[in-house]
Amino acid sequence: MSRVAKAPVAIPAGVEVKLNGQEITVKGAKGELTRVLNDAVVIAQEENNLTFGPKEGAANAWAQAGTARALVNNMVVGVTEGFTKKLTLKGVGYRAAIKGNAVGLTLGFSHPVEHELPAGIKAECPSQTEIIITGCDKQLVGQVAADIRSYRQPEPYKGKGVRYADENVRTKEAKKK
């Protein structure tokens, strides 16, 4: 039985929630998000709270209800506060710059890398070695950050590459003669 599903999701002022069967739409100051939830989940809206529960007879209904509650809570937080991921570039000549709706990266390849940003995602570069990605969809913000990081992951000997700001890269010792 999911303990996560038992806690209701509070709907703050300024956030509008629409239920249409299993489709839920959350609209707030930072944007609008829509998601279709699993059929094994029952959603009920009571004043300023959303409650989740299992549908009778479904095998993994409590697990699905907990997942649905976490996803909807992230939607509510996203449209009110938004989500942020910070990336740092470490390495000689590694640079980042915003070019329209894309992030231009110089990562030691023979060519510059252009990463196109999807709709609803914003990026900024406070310095040449920092990228801050913001948006209201937690999954999409994390995916864009992971895609940018995948161009040049931190290598284990010197730690050069693109890393999350809070990431701790374990370095190996070089081979001795």
Swiss-Prot record:
Keywords: Ribonucleoprotein, Ribosomal protein, RNA-binding, rRNA-binding. One of its GO terms (molecular function) is rRNA binding. Gene3D superfamilies: Ribosomal protein L6, alpha-beta domain. GO terms for cellular component: cytosolic large ribosomal subunit. InterPro entries: Ribosomal_uL6-like, Ribosomal_uL6-like_a/b-dom_sf, Ribosomal_uL6_a/b-dom, Ribosomal_uL6_bac-type, Ribosomal_uL6_CS. One of its GO terms (biological process) is cytoplasmic translation. It comes from the Bacteria. This protein binds to the 23S rRNA, and is important in its secondary structure. It is located near the subunit interface in the base of the L7/L12 stalk, and near the tRNA binding site of the peptidyltransferase center. Belongs to the universal ribosomal protein uL6 family. Part of the 50S ribosomal subunit. This is Large ribosomal subunit protein uL6. It comes from Vibrio campbellii (strain ATCC BAA-1116). The gene is rplF.
